[in-house]
Amino acid sequence: MAGREGHFRLIAGLGNPGSKYAGTRHNAGFWLVDELVRRYGGELREEPKFRGDCARVLIDGYDCRLVKPMTYMNHSGQAVGALANFFKIPPEAILVAHDEIDLPPGSVRLKRGGGHGGHNGLRHIQSTLGTPDFARLRLGVGHPGHKDQVVPHVLSRPSPDELRQLERAIDDAADQIPRLLAGEWDRACQQLHA
């Protein structure tokens, strides 16, 4: 598969493997990767050396690798780091899609670099890469209201209304991936943050 090198060469969607976690808010990043595979005709394959399910797709002529780490959220950096090292992908060319409790359900925000905000998947990726200089695609799943309820909240399934909002957000995010690969960050932000 030959394609142009896009601004982002690796898109990682974070989540937890296994049927116990399928459909939970914490797996929003997995859902985005699944949507990109569906849209662009890829096939996710288990890649033990990369610690995840991986696909390679052409998106508007841009060659892009997708990964769903199968290491559980707290060790997501193992998959992202392995792919980045093997394919010589710098942190600036990595986009990480993840659930975000500080955004309401259905909202999407792009962010370059920054802290992990308490998100263990981001924390591990940042530690593995040795830098926070990767981009994030934040998929809002809402906050439960109290910090003691955060873990049960993200590890549970959204309500039917929240699920519809989250699915719409994932569609909106997937619509902007070609722009992001083309380096049109500001335009994608305008569309998603409006």
Swiss-Prot record:
Listed PANTHER family: PEPTIDYL-TRNA HYDROLASE (PTHR17224:SF1)
Active-site feature positions: H26 (proton acceptor)
UniProt entry keywords in alphabetical sequence: Cytoplasm, Hydrolase, RNA-binding, tRNA-binding
Gene3D superfamilies named among the record's database cross-references: Peptidyl-tRNA hydrolase (3.40.50.1470)
EC number: 3.1.1.29
GO molecular function: peptidyl-tRNA hydrolase activity; tRNA binding
Cited InterPro entries: Pept_tRNA_hydro, Pept_tRNA_hydro_CS, Pept_tRNA_hydro_sf
Similarity remark: Belongs to the PTH family.
Pfam families, A to Z: Pept_tRNA_hydro
Organism in which the protein naturally occurs: Halorhodospira halophila (strain DSM 244 / SL1)
A GO CC term attached to the entry: cytoplasm
UniProt superkingdom: Bacteria
Stated name of the protein: Peptidyl-tRNA hydrolase
